[in-house]
């Protein structure tokens, strides 16, 4: 099942534009730069493009850490990105294994977990988190945090669901107090990773 959200759609940016935006990001104080594509995962075409973009940004000597976020990926594809200069790969588990079929039917939770394992095998640093407030239970939240910790990620994005009228989840099911409690819980359950709080 796919939903049509009111978002801007565009094709891949040019390598020149990507380098220009990375340069501006560094000038604004950024220490990392993310190369993101939409879709299920990496294809040969996308892998080649992200690799070319990574090489170009690294060649600009900006001192930026490069993070790729391109969906499911094989070890071979990830090794190609690493060789091109990508430092981290971001692939979130989103929620618990049990609750996952409620929010996504295009691919399985196990595929997401396997991609995270592939990231580690390829020698990239893993960025892996999830989203809170989609109707999951506290048990689901704990299960997801346990799964994330088992992957020993470098960074953990903690997303809090932002409703979109195109989606069947009509409101955030988490209170501000619960959100703060979950941040505390994540710090305890995933002690060795850097936690990042963002919208989702």
Question: Model features per residue range: what roles?
Answer:
Residues 2-21, 25-119, 125-132, 154-159:
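Core AdoMet radical
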Residues 8-11, 172, 176:
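Hydrophobic alpha-helical scaffolding
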Residues 35-37, 110-168, 178-199:
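Conserved C-terminal portion of the radical SAM core fold
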Residues 46, 79, 102, 138-140, ...:
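Short, well-ordered secondary-structure micro-motifs
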């Amino acid at each position: 099942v796919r939903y049509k959200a009111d978002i801007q759609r565009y094709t891949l940016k040019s390598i020149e534009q990507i380098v220009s935006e990375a340069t501006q990001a560094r000038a604004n104080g950024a220490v990392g730069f993310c190369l993101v594509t939409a879709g299920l995962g990496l294809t040969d075409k996308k892998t080649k493009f992200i690799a070319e973009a990574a090489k170009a940004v690294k060649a600009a000597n900006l001192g930026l850490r490069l993070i790729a976020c391109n969906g499911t990926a094989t070890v071979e594809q990830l090794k190609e990105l690493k060789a091109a200069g990508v430092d981290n790969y971001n692939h979130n588990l989103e929620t618990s294994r049990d609750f996952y079929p409620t929010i996504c039917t295009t691919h399985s939770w196990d595929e997401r977990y396997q991609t995270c394992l592939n990231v580690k095998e390829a020698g990239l640093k893993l960025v892996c988190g999830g989203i809170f407030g989609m109707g999951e239970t506290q048990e689901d939240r704990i299960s997801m945090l346990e799964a994330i910790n088992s992957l020993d990620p470098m960074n953990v994005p903690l997303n809090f669901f932002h409703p979109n009228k195109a989606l069947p989840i009509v409101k955030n099911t988490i209170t501000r107090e619960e959100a703060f409690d979950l941040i505390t819980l994540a710090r305890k359950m995933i002690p060795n990773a850097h936690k990042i709080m963002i919208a989702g």
